[in-house]
Amino acid sequence: MTKTIALLGATGSIGRQTLEVARELGISVAALTAHRQVDLLEQQARQFMPRLAVLYDPDAARELEGRLRGTGIEVLAGEEGLLAAASLDEADTVVTAVMGSVGLRPTLAAIERGKRIALANKETLVCAGELVMDAAEKYGAEIVPVDSEHSAVFQCLQGCRDRREVRRILLTCSGGPFYGKTFGELEDMTAADALRHPNWHMGPKITVDSATLMNKGLEIIEAMRLYRLPVEQVQAVIHRQSIVHSLVEFRDGALLAQLGTPDMKLPIRYAMTYPHRAESPDAPLDLLTCGALTFDRPDEEAFPCLRLAREAAAVGGTACAILNGANEAAVGLFLQGKLGFNDIPRRVERALERMEVQYQPSLADILEADRAARRAVL
């Protein structure tokens, strides 16, 4: 079980809930990082008294350093600070809850030190899954997923001695706020509309990804990397209730599912305590009152991001980094009111069509593909 964490992305939704679980389990915090939220990170730092606090934005880091003077907490900035936080000797687990490809280098740094990775940053595996998984094997680092779907699959696979016994993975998807709408009906949807997720409380970027179904597309790629399966063996299924978090179908016809309330503290707690389970203070799922559980096929004509993700996964190389970088840039423009909802898949598809894919890429190739894809969208 985890004793001390370094938390990358402390002020986001996953980061805040991770600190709740850490407090509940008596887990120490060695490092906290964020992008630029000075007020909240100061509050968290004073409460958990980490050795290190990092703000990616240099100006914000200077302000935080002044506020924390006299506390004994070291303050760093930028990628250098993230790498330092991920590499702290006293942290046995690094929780990667930062958004986007910025989490890639710190995750690799933690892996190279053989730490447990509680992985909530799906972009790391989407962009550089083979590099990350090969490094984890080389350095003996354990990766425990925090995404509810991948945590569910991870739990269903406990006791599976041979991955060839798996016929397919079924990742469940709520369908988001626009379930049942046509592509034409989605044309005029605003950021405010997209941010009304029916079941989960998340940050704005992942909530928009859930509305476009890109989140599920990225999770398909993540599952391929985590479990070393071809894209054909990872599928998405609409499950509006968000009670069944994912399923694994085995070659003998058995189908295992993990069920629970839609609460991110469940997979966070599991990642912290694995291979054990800790008592939860929250009420468990009541099967007698949760109602009917339904399943449906996703509509890829209305939500083409799911198709684009599968196509990028099939191409391989830097295609997934292009997909991810273009999507992050397009979602950012949508949240600023500069793009329409359906322009997100249009811009992503344009980047995939126009950019050259590098096969067997280095880390530098992957990061450059990500940067170039963002530029192509702007």
Feature names for model-found ranges:
Residues 1-378:
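Catalytic, metal-anchored helix/loop core of enzyme active sites in primary metabolism
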